[in-house]
């Protein structure tokens, strides 16, 4: 699970009792909107309220590491409506304040230059629960973890 989906996976897997052989968290925690363990609530709210075309472009630029990644990302840029993304951010904020699951994770990746989900907060959350594997780059790690074999090993 990546980013906010670490929290979402924790909610859904515990609710549906789905058997999973390996749980991998990438650049996220089970407390997505949290001053100490996730994205600071004030920053999150600014991101949510600033989700316009220009705001989304700024977010994507912060999510990626450098010009080369930005050029690659532009080739497969998500085509989602701004209102839909803003609603998703609002719902995650509201629901994550009510649903705070915790489950065992087998592997955790944290990108050393993640400015979306603060590295220190991710490390605070995971602590000694599981080994943290450090990746180069920013929040979007899929130019480093570019196939399933790299994620699982």
Residue spans for each PLM region:
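Hydrophobic/aromatic beta-strand patches that form the interior of the parallel beta-sheet core
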Residues: 22-26, 107-109, 133
